Amino acid sequence: MGQENSKCPHQSLAEKRYKVERPKTKKVSSGSATERCLSTQSDEKNAARRLTVSSCDVSAEDDLPEIKKLSVCEPNEDEATSMTNAAAAAGGAKSKCKHFLTRRERILLEQSWRKTRKTGADHIGSKIFFMVLTAQPDIKAIFGLEKIPTGRLKYDPRFRQHALVYTKTLDFVIRNLDYPGKLEVYFENLGKRHVAMQGRGFEPGYWETFAECMTQAAVEWEANRQRPTLGAWRNLISCIISFMRRGFDEENGKKKQYSYNVQGFSSNRARRSISPYAPGVH
């Protein structure tokens, strides 16, 4: 009876007098309980995946070697793609870098890189890293090279290891020029990792040193012959430094906010402990 009355098409007296409209009920999907359970499980798996895509763990198959002292690593292709997709799903600003290089610039960079690699992979990273340490000798302490004379740097195994990271990073960039979101996510994470290096002397002003040395290295290996190619390198390096700086500033801001909250919590506890209304205080 109750169900039949609820489905009655006739209007009640209150509806006629006050012209009250009946609320429209939504139809419930007729899917089985098994289908609903499967969809719930898939949603939980996707949520767990979204929570873990921001990690930057290195496996044995990664292109860049892990340097634990600096916490610098390159995410593999699948991981970088997952992080990019998660950022796009979250509605972040990751899609704004879609066209930071033109198609022509990407072609020029790929051609330049192929030509430059003929001189030897180690030579490229070694040139950039040596220029950085020469321009800013204080940076040597960050990498544990402060006691190595400038003339002996290129023979030090630690220098060679870090120089190889520069080379492999550039190779990773060139291979992923068609995936700007992947590059942005990687270099933002790399910038965040530099926050921990402040305790060893890293300063935000070093970003400019990195940019200038990388640009100067490109000028030297191009020998000023191809102005459009040099312009493409400048644009690429500018974007890389911009992504790293943004990640660094974001992580540094979170760290400062956390320290402020912890200090505020500690001071509040201290004030409560000396309150005149506390038990045992006369």
From Swiss-Prot:
It comes from the Eukaryota. Residues 1-46 are annotated as: Disordered. Keywords: Heme, Iron, Metal-binding, Oxygen transport, Transport. Pfam families: Globin (PF00042). Residues 100-249 form the Globin domain. Heme b binds at H162, H194. InterPro entries: Globin, Globin-like_sf, Globin/Proto, Mb-like_M, Oxidative_stress_globin-like. Residues 28-41 have a biased composition (Polar residues). Induction: Induced by paraquat, a chemical causing production of reactive oxygen species (ROS). Residues 13-23 have a biased composition (Basic and acidic residues). GO terms for molecular function: heme binding; metal ion binding; oxygen binding; oxygen carrier activity. Involved in oxidative stress resistance. Belongs to the globin family. This is Globin-related protein glb-13. It comes from Caenorhabditis elegans.
